[in-house]
Amino acid sequence: MRLPMQKLLIPTLLGLAMFAGSVNAAAPLRPPQGYFAPVEAFKTGDFKNDCDAMPPPYTGSLQFRSKYEGSDKARSTLNVQSEKAFRDSTADITKLEKDTSKRVMQFMRDGRPEQLECTLNWLTSWAKADALMSKDFNHTGKSMRKWALGSMASAYVRLKFSDSHPLANHQQESQLIEAWFNKLADQVVSDWDNLPLEKTNNHSYWAAWSVMATSVATNRRDLFDWAVKEYKVGVNQVDDQGFLPNELKRQQRALSYHNYALPPLSMIASFALVNGVDLRQENNSALKRLGDKVLAGVKDPEIFEKKNGKEQDMKDLKEDMKYAWLEPFCTLYTCAPDVIERKHGMQPFKTFRLGGDLTKVYDPTHEKGNKGS
């Protein structure tokens, strides 16, 4: 007796669907398409090699003063003296972050081997020294660790996935660097995992971004899953009006900190989406709600003043770079024409904590100028 064709097809299609699901779970992690861009040119001839003296690998205690030292629990009043102490004590770490980002951008533009070698030498030296791995840390110290990891790993992703394969002849350095990134990411997970909700704020989102960038750089599905978990915790804190209760506590800096929460969340959602995990609808599209609330607040800060009773400090929000999150955000959601117009007026967005030039990655047709951070 012959079975009808549709009865034969049902289990076959089910099997295919299950197979596709398992393949997706096992597929190597990847970044968004813009990270596959080739090096623009391979320039030759004389040039000024600006590979400075490498900052010495930071292997000391991660006990740093907070720039809000002495402030009340709102952590909203800057302490100029302690901020200077913080900047001084973390200068070598910040130089590594900024110069890695800058040099990767230069290499992707000019293709000079000296630019690549400088970056890899610095990262390899810090990796060999097990830098930034101290177990003696305070809140500011563990914050520096995850910021630095996010900066380095997200810049490195541009090298690793470029269609020009610049790391092909640098296997040994790549292995050392990636092993160090993995150790740092494991420590970041330990530093920030399972915090009580009242202590989960923008810091946790930035920690999750650093772990997401590392997961793609090193193909670690466990790190990817942790970043997704933390993202969900974060966007489930967004209320139905688009506010983050823990950032509203920052008084006159509430709007700034809502804005500061958006870059890591938007990048995580973007990286997750290309790996088959769609987070856009989480908590009724909470990320979209948060982004829209911030854009409305920038236009009319009284929205936030009415919510928490404090006139908002708009100083930070006058810098174009603070809106770099619009690049991934406007690929995840449909941005209104006035938002797109504003985005184009501020481009290119270059920010070292997200790995460099996001306009080059997400909106390359609008790449222009030499702005950057």
Curated annotation (Swiss-Prot):
InterPro entries: Alginate_lyase, Alginate_lyase_dom, Chondroitin_lyas. CDD domains: AlgLyase. Keywords: Lyase, Periplasm, Signal. NCBIfam families: PRK00325.1-2, PRK00325.1-3. GO terms for biological process: alginic acid catabolic process. The keyword Lyase applies. It is found in: Periplasm. Disulfide bonds: none annotated. The gene is algL. Residues 1-25 form the signal peptide. This is Alginate lyase. Its main location: periplasm. Its EC number is 4.2.2.3. Catalyzes the depolymerization of alginate by cleaving the beta-1,4 glycosidic bond between two adjacent sugar residues via a beta-elimination mechanism. May serve to degrade mislocalized alginate that is trapped in the periplasmic space. It comes from Pseudomonas fluorescens (strain SBW25). The lineage of its organism: Bacteria, Pseudomonadati, Pseudomonadota, Gammaproteobacteria, Pseudomonadales.
